[in-house]
Amino acid sequence: MPSSSAADPTEILTAPYSEIERTQDERLRHMLALCARGHDYYERKWAGIDIGSIRGVADLERLPLTSKQDLMADPEAFRLRVPDLPLHERALWEVIYTTGSTADPTPVYNTTYDYHAYLFQSRRVAEISGIRETDVIANLFPLTPAPMGAFQRSVTNAYAAGATICAALPGSAHGNFDVHRPLDYAVRTVEVHSASVLWGVPSFLRRVLLRAQELKADFTSVRMCAISGEATTPEMREELRRCLRALKAAGTTVFNRYGSTELGAFAQCREEGDWHNPAPEIQYHEVVDPENGRRLPDGERGMLAVTHLDRRGTVLIRFLVGDVVSLTRAPCPHCGRTSERVVGPVVRGSDLVKVKGMLINPGALVAALAAMPALDEFQVVVRREKESDPYSMDELAVRIACREAPEKLMQEVAARALEITRVRTKVELVEAKEIYDPGRQTKAKRFVDVRK
């Protein structure tokens, strides 16, 4: 069994990277040995590979990559089942679901051991990002049909930081119990509890801040927005800061949390900075070529892969998260921490789409639209010119909602879209709720491709 952390649990974050890697090598050997004994998927996948010959993270290239599709196809096969482990390493604490391309979300199993590890990781995240035990966190994530990581993890992060937490319970109603609450209740929750940290999906946080201005709510206690759950642009984050300034908030810090159900959260030590791995003894990251599994040098962009070094529930080795990033292992110039950092921009591997024969990046158009403060809401749509005809030409459209000068704004949007995509774009004026209704949707869909 690997040794426990040093007396100072954060010491590893400032150690020379060679020391970090030695700890990772030790944890990896133990993790692989457990997988060889009781992990159905990897026992089959690694047939013919001498797992004992893999002595550290430098040898991981000899193991195949694991895709999201592999996990979605048979999530039970990724559960570690070693019956002679201590009870806390075997006992199921919780099941959290991650979204996928199928109708049903994919379960990720956490034992008591894993939950404690997440508390440990979350304490580090709080320290790096500046969340304090005196903070009051307003959980503005939606209450969803399946227990999703964002909502569930808000309270865990509060526990880890020693902070107070309250929840607004927004989201689309489902089932027989009337427990979901409207947008105005979210505003009231922040005001009544004098919340200092707003925790949620950025598109919904923006709606809360705009509604707070309309209601003249007291948000002077707010000092930070901690956002995750959907991709954001620098322009969107600046829009959140603008709203905070308009409300005379105590602070305008916007931390963009990066992570997933499978890997937990990374943390920024400063706004718009890189994302620190807060627990290098728990997980290892590499950037790879997804076609051949080859590890790419630090600084080169490729697909992010995570390897669990110390888990007991769902265990993933060389798991492709789905994001294109780069890594650096140089000491952080701002805080001096030495664990690896994810360097943006973070681009989903599936973000490039072909429209009328042109390969475009919808994210670039979304970023440009987010920088237009006159837009209350917007959505980029790729569809067929004739919905009933699957062979008709592609059409790129932008649906917008605004309150003033719609004709002029529509012309500006069309010109900006053409400049970015080189594809002529149709602009449609609609009601804001047709694009994003906080009472029915968990987050805004800024880009949709509805072609059949």
Located regions from the model:
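Conserved AMP-binding/adenylate-forming
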Residues: T232-P331
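AMP-binding adenylation
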Residues: M1-E26, H30-A33, A212-L215, N292-R294, ...
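Active-site phosphate/ATP/adenylate-binding loop shared across adenylate-forming ligases
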Residues: P2-T10, Q69-G251, F255, L263, ...
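Nucleotide 5′-phosphate-binding alpha/beta core
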Residues: M1-Y97, A103-I128, R132, V192-S194, ...
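Conserved beta-strand termini and adjacent loop/short-helix elements that scaffold enzyme active sites
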Residues: A168-P170, R257, V288, R383, ...
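Conserved residues at the C-terminal ends of beta-strands
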Residues: V201, S228, T307, T328, ...
